[in-house]
A protein has these predicted regions:
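Catalytic cores of Mg2+-dependent Asp-rich isoprenoid enzymes
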Residues: 1-199, 205-324
Length: 324
């Protein structure tokens, strides 16, 4: 029997399988990318999911989360052997209920082996992203309160370290593989941050009832839901501009971004139409809606007019909130 190191196909098969287990959305969107980009983006998502799992562990103190985050980052940056992270992390998460995420942590060596088969440029971009996210989350571990983050500035910073930086990473990887996109995005890299932040704001608003139940809020204190939805709409406008900069010949990249963007638009619109909700399942898009929109992206991703029309129609309720 081959050792894991001799079987890169088995590693990639694991990456594909676990991606489907830990994220229905990204299991749908990531395979739309060209194969070389699909591998590194899928790999990055799993690394970020490990960071996220540490953050979500309600039983752990902020100092324990910070210690585990540092061990993980050291393993990613090859400063220490990966088992110096895996063993203490599994021990700390012995009461953690999500078995798929625990399995992902067990397979951290597999995920890192895949990372090291990517190009040097892509590896550098991933390491930067995971470093900023891990350090940023460690900083925010000490700010977990029921009241929420201090102000909008702190909220923006949180959204940057958990998602804006992913927008930057995607832009770097897309640019590494598409010289035309690299040329078009030059000077407008801030749109990439807004793209990531729009997706993160969607998650924060959607997950707020569950966060509240475990004594945490990632929303800024003393800022209304309406104001947050207006900010999210502005981020979506920038995200739209980002998507339209992607060359039509890079159709897989366009479709990947448009699918994630569209699901966020529809979810935020549902939030805008629900004055009160007690569980994120109330905002969940139906399977039929997701499949129908997936089919629509295949038609619309190369058509700027259709993308703009979708945005205009799907965000009417958000736009009303933004109007005086």
């Amino acid at each position: 029997m081959n050792s894991p190191k001799d079987n890169p196909n088995a590693d990639l098969a694991y990456q594909k399988t676990i991606l489907g287990s830990v994220s229905r959305t990204f299991a749908l969107t990531i395979p739309l990318l060209p194969p070389t980009i699909e591998k590194v983006v899928g790999n990055t998502y799993l690394l970020c999911r490990i960071v996220d799992t540490i953050e979500d562990a309600a039983d752990l103190s902020p100092s324990s989360k910070q210690a585990l985050s540092k061990l993980f980052l050291d393993a990613v940056l090859e400063k220490s052997p990966v088992n110096t992270f895996v063993e203490p992390c599994l021990s700390a998460l012995k009461n953690y209920s999500n078995q798929d995420e625990l399995d992902l942590i067990i397979h951290t060596p597999t995920v890192l082996r895949i990372l090291h088969t990517c190009s040097i440029k892509d590896q550098a971009a991933v390491s930067r992203c995971v470093s900023i996210m891990s350090d940023g989350m460690s900083h925010f571990h000490t700010k977990q309160t029921q009241v929420g983050l201090k102000d909008l500035q702190e909220f923006e910073q949180y959204c940057y370290v958990v998602a804006g930086v992913v927008g930057e990473l995607l832009t770097t990887i897309f640019s590494n593989h598409s010289p035309q996109f690299a040329q078009r995005i030059r000077g407008q890299e801030g749109l990439a941050i807004a793209f990531g932040q729009a997706l993160q704001m969607t998650n924060i608003l959607k997950d707020s009832p569950e966060d509240k139940a475990r004594g945490v809020s990632w929303k800024p204190a003393n800022v209304s839901q309406t104001e947050l939805l207006c900010i999210a709409y502005q981020k979506l406008e920038d995200a739209l501009r980002y998507i339209l900069l992607i060359p039509k010949q890079d159709i897989g990249i366009r479709q990947f971004c448009f699918l994630a963007f569209g699901l966020a638009c529809m979810t935020l619109s549902k939030i805008a139409n629900h004055k009160q909700f007690t569980h994120k399942d109330e905002l969940k898009l139906s399977r039929h809606t997701v499949i129908a929109f997936y089919g629509f992206t295949k038609i619309a991703s190369s058509n700027d007019a259709l993308i703009k029309a979708f945005f205009s129609l799907s965000t009417r309720s958000l736009r009303k909130l933004s109007q005086p």
